[in-house]
Amino acid sequence: MKLETICGVDVEVAQSEADLRAIYGQPSELARRKSLTRLDRHCQDFIAKSPFLCLSTANATGDADLSPRGDAPGFVRVLDEQTLLIPDRLGNNRIDSLLNLTTNPHIGLLFLIPGVDETLRVNGLGQVVTAAPWLEEMAVNGKTPRSVIAVQVREAFLQCAKALKRSRLWSNDYRVDRQDVPSLGQILFDQIGCATPVAELDAAIETSYRDRMY
């Protein structure tokens, strides 16, 4: 352990696996053995039913990024047990994840299914494909994605339900009134101090949501 100070508080920080194992112990045999090197039928079925995933990448220097991806269930296509495709739909053109993959192919995915507390974790190597028959095949409403992320699967396993059960994610227990959270236009106005009025920002955002989904 290493002694450090965080926000004026003296703390001990783990520096190795040995430090962590001294606190957590070893995983169970089931937890160790559940990691697969391919997408079996259960993983493929989970992906087919999932309308949402979180996509994790990092650049060449290790700066991490996490991006949400969502569409109708089945929007992620499984080509075989080792390969899946994620279409890149219209966004704001920051393309953080795509830029990261050009210098560091390592990628992590977390698939969710509404109403199911377990999640699916997939890790592997990603490539940004800009020309292939897949792009046309993954078009929606006549709109073709400009690229597809092809993932070579190295690891896949189901995550237990504890996190989603604790958060009660699929129930209304912690649901907030939308009016209790500032609009995106208001937040951007406060954060970057732009001259555009909040109402105009919100209107532009809603127009983008309506006209630029695909």
Task: Give the positions of each predicted feature.
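Binding-site signature for planar aromatic cofactors or substrates
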Residues: M1-Y214
